[in-house]
């Protein structure tokens, strides 16, 4: 916990602040996370700070300086200062200078993972081990740190070594989702490269909420595709109880990173597409498209299912869910002016499909290409105007009726949730304008991250079987992370070693 955690009384209200309630969808994500980039380059912290400050001083972007509070009814609201000062900064910025030592001499950070070019690899140590060494000692961490202290939404911490730099951005998920964070990084990079005129217009919480207009005057929303599979009260309690039971008897779980050589993924995808074409000779080859990410979702779910202990019963339902961004659909509906905007808010929804465990593991398992095709079809189905309207309406109705979001499937199902960050091109973010002079003199053309650590606070009860596809490096290696039980990790590692 950071220094902020000690205080429990909220700061007094400043009369000149602009007060705005949080949007419905944003209130669903009351937790914080760190997003750390590791460079094997020396970057200038002041250049980075000045560029970030330039972005946040722009029209609209100053909203990121808002403070978080609860009103008299315990509803969340933003308090946006009229002016920022040293006492009430626009963003938190801290540095940690270790330029007299190499990152290779740091007792923990010298273990930053590097891909194995020959086979898939699960890396040690766990993400939580790196996290505490990549953030500021007094950086906000828990949700209450923002509620009970007069601090802005964004904290940036820079750690400098003689041969490396770590940039950690800490923020609340109530502020925005992954693509909102990527909009900030894009604006930051454009500013560093002197291309501020290309920064997309900002839309934030002071603007009209595009999700509030989703129904577009309809008296009754469309029916959600899985509406008939919503579990009732007892099914929901059963799902929660099974999770708690698993956490109680198997307390050891961790978020860990694993890498897949580019050639391995290429072979996996080529094989999957060939299987799909063979299964559907009536289709044109171009109509049998599945992306690398579709294939990885299906393949990794199979690994998770077959390495559970005790084994999943063949008939047990597996729910494979992809979190997808709705900004394109909102623009299509005219609720956002275009896709080229910096929309700060949460706009991710679920694209799911259900299959028995036997489809992923065992003698009767389906071919990878067919499972990947189900991933693709579920995304195509859910990323429609009708199904976005239906899912959003179901969220709001269930939250008002039960206090929680709806759960679809069965109370004893295995849920595997994926977040695909590939679209953000994280490993292609070039911070070269911030290189110090000695680095530029070496003729370096780019400064790209070699490792990305995206984490939040973990507890014994944190969700399991959740996976992120972090992206593809310049060398072609794929980076992923997943939170699994320790015994499942051990079996997957053994399987990787046999490859």
Swiss-Prot record:
| Record-level GO BP terms | antibiotic biosynthetic process
| Superkingdom assignment | Eukaryota
> From which lineage does this chain's organism come?
Eukaryota, Fungi, Dikarya, Ascomycota, Pezizomycotina
The cellular location(s) given in this protein's UniProt record come to: Nucleus
Gene that this sequence comes from: sdnM
Q: In which pathway does it act?
A: Antibiotic biosynthesis
Record's keyword annotation contains Transcription:
yes
Q: Which GO terms describe its cellular component?
A: nucleus
Gene3D superfamilies in the record: Chloramphenicol acetyltransferase-like domain
- InterPro entries from the entry? CAT-like_dom_sf
Q: Which UniProt keywords apply?
A: Antibiotic biosynthesis, Nucleus, Transcription, Transcription regulation
Q: What does this protein do?
A: Transcriptional regulator; part of the gene cluster that mediates the biosynthesis of sordarin and hypoxysordarin, glycoside antibiotics with a unique tetracyclic diterpene aglycone structure. First, the geranylgeranyl diphosphate synthase sdnC constructs GGDP from farnesyl diphosphate and isopentenyl diphosphate. The diterpene cyclase sdnA then catalyzes the cyclization of GGDP to afford cycloaraneosene.
Q: What is this protein called?
A: Transcriptional regulator sdnM
